[in-house]
Amino acid sequence: MTWHPHANRAKTFLLLAVFSGLIVAVGAMFGRNIMFLAVLFALGMNAYVYFNSDKLALRAMHAQPVNEMQAPVMYKIVRELATTARQPMPRLYISDTAAPNAFATGRNPRNSAVCCTTGILQMLNERELRAVLGHELSHVYNRDILISCVAGAMASVITALANLAFFASMFGGNRDGGTNPFAILLVSLLGPIAATVIRLAVSRSREYQADQSGAELTGDPLALASALRKISSGVERAPLPPEPQLADQAHLMIANPFRAGEKIGKLFATHPPMADRIARLEAMAGRGPGQY
């Protein structure tokens, strides 16, 4: 199977290009020294996240590894999908929580893990579970962890630039160019917000792509639509607790793990609107397998 993100890939790269332009613009305003420190900081921090993304996410969810005897249905489905995609079998984990969700993590297919909660395993039938696991495997095969880390690094650069420039202005300003202190204050306030908005837009774009790629892998977009409906209502009944370490991993989940009332708007959402995702999957089913 060939993994091709279609229009969502173009959208992702466009957003990353906007990120790059924002970094250059902000860096030019504050000078090379501050920009160098910000880039160095961001690269170091996100390199750590990239190489340890699986450990961080699995630890936050208190996930435990499982084998074929412990989770026969989940193991069978993942093995079949990995074989279909001609990709390595990921490590499998289960998180003992009633909150219905699933996520994939790992820097590449050979170093990947897929985790389901006990809540989602109890809620979905086998067809729906297969669709969810296809979605999660697509995140791995489309290298979404790498893309997420690149977007995160760029956001960190902009935030670090804004913070460093703000403190530099407090202790003598920008000696290289005499930048207006009001401009520094404005960028210090708006830069991190803009970076967060773009990073979350990248995350939402990757969710749309995983829905599409997962439906192509399983050949059953309606099963994923059905699963998303159940997960959405299930999260309202049994959300994850709003703890900082869980909030940091929310973008990895197949659905926002917190109640809808706790969202603060589409621009700051980690996931696209559930109704929109379901509508797209139903449209895929209407086109037929040969025209996805």
UniProtKB/Swiss-Prot annotation:
Membrane-crossing residue ranges in chain numbering: 10-30, 33-53, 145-165, 182-202
MF term (GO), any: metalloendopeptidase activity
Kinase keyword on record: no
Protein residues bound to Zn(2+): 135, 139, 207
Cofactor: Zn(2+)
Gene Ontology BP annotations: proteolysis
EC number(s) stated in the UniProt entry for this protein: 3.4.24.-
PROSITE patterns cross-referenced by the UniProt entry: ZINC_PROTEASE
InterPro entries cross-referenced by the UniProt entry: HtpX_protease, Pept_M48_protease_HtpX, Peptidase_M48
GO annotations of cellular component type: plasma membrane
Membrane topology category: Multi-pass membrane protein
Catalytic site: 136
CDD domains recorded: M48B_HtpX_like
Cofactor binding summary note: Binds 1 zinc ion per subunit.
Record key words, sorted: Cell membrane, Hydrolase, Membrane, Metal-binding, Metalloprotease, Protease, Transmembrane, Transmembrane helix, Zinc
Pfam families membership: Peptidase_M48
Location within or outside the cell: Cell membrane
Family: Belongs to the peptidase M48B family.
Alphabetical list of HAMAP family matching this protein: Pept_M48_protease_HtpX
Name of the featured protein: Protease HtpX homolog
Gene from which this protein is expressed: htpX
